[in-house]
C-alpha cells in the first residue's frame, strides 16, 4: 500500500516532461528558451496554454474510464475475489510508466503523445486499488484488527503522498526522467511481488 500511495506523486515529474515536449517540439522554441522558460514570460505563457489543454484532456481521458470501471468492480470482486482489484491497477501503472519512458526517450514526439498514458485508467486506477484494498482488509480481518489495518492504510496514504512529492524533485534533478520513471516501475514490480 505504501508503494502505491508513493508512486503517483513521483510521477508529478511528468509535468516537467510535458513542458519540455510542448516547448521544444510543439512550439519549436530554442532549447535555450526552454531551459530558462521563466525568463521568457511570453514564451512561458504560450507553453502554459498548451500544457493546460493537454492536462485537461488527460484528466478527462483518465477519469471517465476509471469511474465507469470502478462502478462495476465491487460486485465483480465479490464473485471473482479481491486480488484482481489489487493487480489490475498495477498493470495500468506499468503501462502509464511505459508511455512516460517512451516520451522521455523519443524527444521528437509532440506533447499530445502523453495522452496515451491514459490507457492505464482502463485498469481502474487508484479507485479500483482502494476498493480492492478495503474489501480485502474487510474479508481477512475482524473487529479490532480491521480497525487497526484500515488506520494503517490511511497512514500510508497520508505519508506516501507527501513523501513522494518531496522526493520527486531531487530524484529528477539528480537522475532525470529515467530515474523517476524507473523507480516507479521497480516499486510497482515490488507491489506485484507482495500481492501475488
PLM regions: where:
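Paired intracellular helix-loop junctions of major facilitator superfamily
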Residues: 24, 124-128, 138-146
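Membrane-interface helix-entry/capping residues at the boundaries of transmembrane alpha-helices
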Residues: 55, 86-89, 146, 150
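Conserved MFS/SLC helix-loop-helix module at the cytosolic interface between two early adjacent transmembrane helices
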Residues: 65-110
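Residue-level signature of mid-helix packing/kink "hotspots" within the transmembrane helices
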Residues: 59, 63-71, 161-162
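Pair of pore-lining "gating" transmembrane helices in MFS-fold secondary transporters
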Residues: 1-38
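Hydrophobic core of transmembrane alpha-helices in multi-pass small-molecule transporters
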Residues: 95-128, 136
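Glycine-rich segments within core transmembrane alpha-helices of 12-TM secondary carriers
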Residues: 59, 127, 145-173, 179-181, ...
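Hydrophobic alpha-helical segments of secondary membrane carriers
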Residues: 58, 116-122, 134-137, 150-156
Amino acid at each position: 500500500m505504501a508503494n502505491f500511495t508513493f508512486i503517483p506523486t513521483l510521477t508529478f515529474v511528468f509535468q516537467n516532461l510535458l513542458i519540455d515536449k510542448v516547448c521544444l517540439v510543439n512550439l519549436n522554441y530554442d532549447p535555450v528558451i526552454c531551459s530558462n522558460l521563466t525568463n521568457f514570460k511570453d514564451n512561458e505563457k504560450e507553453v502554459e496554454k498548451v500544457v493546460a489543454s493537454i492536462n485537461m484532456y488527460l484528466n478527462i481521458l483518465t477519469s471517465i474510464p476509471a469511474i465507469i470501471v470502478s462502478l462495476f468492480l465491487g460486485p465483480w470482486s465479490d464473485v471473482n475475489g479481491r486480488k484482481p482489484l489489487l493487480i489490475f491497477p498495477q498493470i495500468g501503472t506499468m503501462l502509464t510508466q511505459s508511455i512516460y519512458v517512451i516520451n522521455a526517450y523519443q524527444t521528437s514526439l509532440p506533447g499530445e503523445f502523453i495522452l496515451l498514458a491514459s490507457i492505464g485508467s482502463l485498469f481502474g486506477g487508484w479507485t479500483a486499488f482502494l476498493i480492492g484494498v478495503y474489501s480485502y482488509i474487510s474479508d481477512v480481518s475482524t473487529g479490532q484488527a480491521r480497525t487497526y489495518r484500515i488506520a494503517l492504510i490511511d497512514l500510508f496514504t497520508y505519508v506516501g503522498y507527501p513523501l513522494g512529492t518531496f522526493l520527486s524533485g531531487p530524484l529528477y534533478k539528480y537522475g532525470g526522467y529515467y530515474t523517476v520513471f524507473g523507480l516507479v516501475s521497480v516499486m510497482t514490480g515490488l507491489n506485484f511481488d507482495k500481492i501475488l
